[in-house]
From Swiss-Prot:
<keyword id="KW-0479">Metal-binding</keyword>
<keyword id="KW-0067">ATP-binding</keyword>
<keyword id="KW-0077">Bacteriochlorophyll biosynthesis</keyword>
<dbReference type="Pfam" id="PF00148">
    <property type="entry name" value="Oxidored_nitro"/>
</dbReference>
<dbReference type="InterPro" id="IPR000510">
    <property type="entry name" value="Nase/OxRdtase_comp1"/>
</dbReference>
<dbReference type="InterPro" id="IPR005970">
    <property type="entry name" value="Protochl_reductN"/>
</dbReference>
<dbReference type="GO" id="GO:0019685">
    <property type="term" value="P:photosynthesis, dark reaction"/>
</dbReference>
<keyword id="KW-0004">4Fe-4S</keyword>
<dbReference type="GO" id="GO:0051539">
    <property type="term" value="F:4 iron, 4 sulfur cluster binding"/>
</dbReference>
<comment type="similarity">
    <text>Belongs to the BchN/ChlN family.</text>
</comment>
<keyword id="KW-0411">Iron-sulfur</keyword>
<feature type="binding site">
    <location>
        <position position="117"/>
    </location>
    <ligand>
        <name>[4Fe-4S] cluster</name>
    </ligand>
</feature>
<keyword id="KW-0560">Oxidoreductase</keyword>
<keyword id="KW-0602">Photosynthesis</keyword>
<dbReference type="GO" id="GO:0016636">
    <property type="term" value="F:oxidoreductase activity, acting on the CH-CH group of donors, iron-sulfur protein as acceptor"/>
</dbReference>
<comment type="subunit">
    <text>Protochlorophyllide reductase is composed of three subunits; BchL, BchN and BchB. Forms a heterotetramer of two BchB and two BchN subunits.</text>
</comment>
<dbReference type="GO" id="GO:0046872">
    <property type="term" value="F:metal ion binding"/>
</dbReference>
Length: 428
């Protein structure tokens, strides 16, 4: 069974030479603290302690949809005015809070001290605090730090900073046998599906980063092959490559085509016979293709505009244009790593407008002029655009929702069809 690909055929255009507009100006994005929402669910024995303001606390609690009395595995050490004014020693108070937290929550095995805009403004050295507290609480608890500040970042970079801080803690691989390391947070159900697929293909050993438990960190070394599951992890991948790992060039596992290309990259690296690959993946590909057919009818020829927000924009645009026949008006992305996204850029239709960075006023002008059928954007832009009669899809929902793999291809398509159906019902 071959995947449906619309007439926007893959171009031979060099992705490096493809024309990409770069903009710099006012931006509309969440900060990296947002990554805690999915990371605290993924690493089940970790706790994320944000050193920040009440605004930081409200952001995370609202985004996670969890009441604080439910004792989630995240919290905020709130910096008061006296801390910001330098009238107190913030390190003493931080030590007290961490001690209280670890005494109350003995299940915590990994503690992240997460920097924020306020803590960085007053130059609070969380790396030194993490080292000091690690010496005190080791070996029972590992304490690390990273920045979730919103200064010059977008919200998915929080995961990159978190995982990059964890790379030095990974054990060195002792086995000379090749291993596969899937890098990037995936929902447990998606991870299990991919694990079954790798087992059926005879690929292994396979490890996932981040792991579900911090006590089961994957090993890394010169024989480790990296398969990126998320496109927003350049610092993490660089740190792994410095440990000797080698990245496999592949599209990202969104849709049938992307998932097949992603799995094929691993299969080729591990010498899997092409006939065996087709035998293992064929039924899943056929089932996913049938599930996509209904949404293709709804989405074909619909015009879509991407504001830069999540860094998922390029793979999503490829999926929507090639598998669902949508028309790309403009594809904006906060940052574009040309090497990591080279396989995706090759598959975009020739001449598509790609924008790196953001000048939100200019992009709003272009969006209003184009009047697309649907706009993918952040929460801050969605309501104003909806008020103007433009249908929107929240980009952050595409990060929170399991969308990778064959089984989720139709779910991903539905995320774009649903707002259009809702708009049609409201108009009717």
């Amino acid at each position: 069974m071959t995947v449906h690909v619309s007439n926007c055929a893959a171009t031979a255009e060099d992705p490096v030479s493809r024309e990409i507009r770069t903009e710099s100006g006012q931006r509309e994005v969440f900060c990296g603290l947002t990554g805690i929402v999915w990371l605290h669910r993924k690493i089940q024995d970790a706790f994320f302690l944000v050193v920040g303001s009440r605004t930081c606390a409200h952001l995370i609690q609202s985004a996670a949809g969890v009441m604080i009395f439910a004792e989630p595995r995240f919290g905020t050490a709130i910096m008061e005015e006296k801390d910001l004014a330098g009238l107190t020693d913030a390190n003493i108070e931080l030590d007290r809070i961490v001690t209280q937290l670890l005494t109350r929550r003995p299940d915590i095995k990994l503690l992240f001290l997460v920097g924020s805009c306020p803590s960085e403004v007053i130059k609070l050295d969380l790396s030194r605090a993490a080292l000091r507290l690690s010496q005190r609480f080791s070996p029972g608890v590992r304490i690390l730090n990273y920045s979730g500040s919103g200064i010059e970042t977008t919200f998915t970079q929080g995961e990159d900073a978190c995982l990059a801080s964890l790379v030095p803690e990974l054990p060195a691989a002792q086995d000379e046998k090749s291993s596969l390391l899937v890098v990037g947070s995936l929902a447990d159900v998606v991870e299990d599906q991919f694990m079954r697929m790798f087992d059926a293909l005879g690929i292994g050993p396979v490890q996932f980063f981040p792991p579900r438990k911090s006590t089961a960190l994957p090993s890394v070394g010169p024989n480790t092959k990296i398969l990126m599951a998320q496109p927003f992890l350049p610092d993490t991948v660089r740190a792994l490559q410095e440990r000797g790992a080698k990245r496999l060039a592949a599209p990202f596992p969104l849709g049938v085509e992307g998932t097949t290309g992603w799995l094929r990259a691993a299969a080729d690296a591990f010498g899997v016979d092409p006939a065996h690959f087709d035998k293992v993946t064929g039924p899943n590909r056929a089932r996913a293709e049938r599930a996509l057919a209904a949404y293709r009818t709804e989405l074909a020829d619909r015009r879509i505009f991407f504001f830069p927000d999540s860094q998922l924009e390029i793979p999503l645009a490829r999926f929507l244009s090639r598998e669902l026949s949508m028309k790309l008006v403009e594809v904006g992305t906060p940052y574009l790593h040309r090497e990591h996204l080279a396989e995706e850029l090759k598959l975009l239709p020739a001449g598509v407008a790609i924008t790196e960075g953001q000048d939100v006023d200019l992009q709003l002008d272009r969006c209003r002029l184009a009047r697309p059928d649907i706009v993918v954007c952040g929460l801050g832009l969605a309501n104003p655009l909806e008020a103007e009669g433009i249908t929107t899809k929240w980009s952050i929902e595409l990060v929170f929702t399991p969308i990778q793999g064959y089984e989720q291809a139709a779910d991903l398509a539905e995320l774009f069809a649903r707002p259009l159906v809702r708009r049609a019902k409201l108009v009717a």
